[in-house]
């Protein structure tokens, strides 16, 4: 079995990158699958999490990181050009690899993953809840532009997701949110270890570690 994952980069610590690494390593080590990971950014940077030695990385070097900090109006033409470049290079890469399954982690490649002509089954895997995916509320765009862009993105996204063989979410709660789709499957995040003991709730302290952002829900721990 040959599986190709599409993700922007692996050089920084984050939940999506950690989960992908755990699953890819397990598939390679336990099942002996041929795992390929296709990247668009982070050329020359070492993966933050250790990968099984049999896993192959394919760096397309699109460099979306270059767009960080640019204004919307300056970024837009550059983004469109990079999307066209990614579409071409990804199709070439998949034809070279010839995977049985290609899995998009719903980053920039999801806009055209179904147009790839390599013949592999196409899956999508999302590591965000629906309300926070493609959320422009914190952008510097005027409110009316936020609405226009968000509605366009979501309509385009639903069209692409319907064409996937399966669309994978992390929980049954998440699955209930995607009412527009009938191809949703639930695969929970893996546990990297099992605790040696279970709390008896005698210590009334909670320790939370994570990025301080609205979707992490730290405010809900304090109320």
Regions found by a protein language model. Give the residues of each.
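Carbohydrate-associated surface elements
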Residues: 173, 190
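Active-site proximal beta-strand in glycosyltransferases
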Residues: 3, 101-103, 116-136, 147, ...
């Amino acid at each position: 079995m040959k599986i190709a994952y599409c993700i922007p980069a692996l050089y920084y610590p984050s939940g999506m990158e950690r989960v992908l690494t755990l699953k890819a390593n397990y598939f390679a080590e336990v099942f002996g699958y041929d795992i390929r990971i296709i990247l668009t950014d982070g050329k020359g940077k070492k993966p933050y999490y250790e990968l099984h030695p049999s896993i192959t990385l394919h760096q397309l070097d699109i460099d979306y990181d270059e767009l960080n900090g640019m204004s919307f109006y300056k970024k837009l033409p550059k983004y469109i050009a990079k999307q066209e470049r990614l579409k071409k290079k990804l199709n070439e890469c998949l034809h070279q690899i010839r995977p049985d399954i290609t899995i998009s982690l719903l980053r920039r490649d999801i806009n055209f993953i179904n147009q790839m002509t390599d013949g592999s089954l196409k899956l999508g895997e999302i590591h965000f809840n629906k309300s926070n995916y493609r959320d422009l509320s914190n952008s510097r765009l005027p409110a009316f532009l936020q609405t226009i862009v968000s509605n366009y993105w979501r309509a385009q996204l639903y069209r692409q997701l319907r064409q996937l063989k399966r669309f994978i979410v992390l929980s049954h709660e998440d699955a209930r949110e995607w009412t527009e789709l009938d191809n949703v499957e639930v695969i929970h995040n893996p546990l990297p270890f099992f605790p040696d003991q279970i709390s008896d709730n005698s210590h009334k302290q909670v320790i939370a570690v994570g990025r301080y952002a609205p979707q992490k829900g730290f405010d809900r721990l304090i109320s």
